[in-house]
Every structure is written in structure tokens, then in C-alpha cells.
Amino acid sequence: MIEIERIRAALTKRPRFADRVFTEEERRYCFSRPNPAQHFAARFAGKEAVGKAIGCGVEFMWRDIEIAGRPKPSVTLSGKVAELAERFGAGDIDLSMTHSKGMAAAVAIVQSRGTQGPLNQAV
């Protein structure tokens, strides 16, 4: 969950923020919407949720997780995040994103491929 205003401020004060965090396709989509900050915030929350669900926390290249699609978001992994997902036995990723006037949130569920790995261990 993230405050939309934090993303709006980052987009305004740090011109390279969008380039560092979002893929070209994500930027194109968000900037085409009437209120880009809320769409960027939802995708930011989505990336964070996916990273945590896979098991890499928030220590990853943000652009290694791309969120596309409307109305149902789809997730594409690349780079180190894709390598970790493979090693951890990650399968399909279900993602739900939402935003209100002031907040954006996301929940990610990573399904196991049924192989050995951290995603298959009981907690």
C-alpha cells in the first residue's frame, strides 16, 4: 500500500523516477490516463507485492517486474526477478490492484509449480 501523493511527488521532483521504476509500456499506459499518479502508484504497489510474494522482498530492479493489462493485470518477470522466481518454484502470479482518492494497494499470490523451493515449504 502506498500514498498516491508520494508517487505524485516523486514523479514531479525526480524526473528519472518513472524511467528507473517503470517499463516503457507501463509509463505509456499511466501517462495516457487522466490521473497518472494513481495508476503509477497502483503499479508500484503491485511490483512491491509481487517481489515480496516471490521472496525477493523489495531488493530488485523495479523494471524486472512489468504489470500490464486491463481490467485484469498481468505480470511479466525478467532479469534477476525471473531467475529468483524460477529458483523458488514460482508459477502463475495472480495480482489485484486498487486505488482510492489517496491510496493505492495491491495483493499478489504466487502459485507453486510443484517443485522443490521456498514457495513449497510450510510456514
Give the residues covered by each predicted segment.
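Core catalytic alpha/beta fold that binds nucleotide/phospho-ligands
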Residues: 1-123
